[in-house]
């Protein structure tokens, strides 16, 4: 008996993002074989998005790029960014998911950032590099991320992306409720 296959393209080659997409889809579609592939996709926004708006647009741009490049059932893009809110600076990620002619946007949890980290970002650095320097790590953005470091491993960048993907999939799981 041949198993049904769902092909997923992720707008990044970062293993954290690819694994989050694969894990979320495996949870949502346990009776399917999930084939997940990452590809480089331009965000069209600064390398370190500093606003909610730029972060969201980066995810949308990546997902649209992927749709134009290769055939798949679902297209995922995750864009991490920072912004300064009324309660202080925080990092978060937007998730853009395309399926057929529909687009769903979701956002991961907000992680409060130390002011010294935010100031380094305002000066032009990227969050992963700042965290590597602060915690003496190497390429943390392809591992637990700032989330893993600041929560002492109780949450990770991947776990945040996985949850955000599952939530952003709601319109595709319940299409009758999202006309």
Curated annotation (Swiss-Prot):
Gene3D superfamilies in alphabetical order: 3.90.950.10
Annotated catalysed reactions: XTP + H2O = XDP + phosphate + H(+); ITP + H2O = IDP + phosphate + H(+)
EC number(s) from the headed UniProt entry: 3.6.1.73
Keyword Manganese among UniProt keywords: yes
Free-text remark on how the cofactor is bound: Binds 1 divalent metal cation per subunit; can use either Mg(2+) or Mn(2+).
Homology family: Belongs to the YjjX NTPase family.
Entry function: Phosphatase that hydrolyzes non-canonical purine nucleotides such as XTP and ITP to their respective diphosphate derivatives. Probably excludes non-canonical purines from DNA/RNA precursor pool, thus preventing their incorporation into DNA/RNA and avoiding chromosomal lesions.
Protein name: Inosine/xanthosine triphosphatase
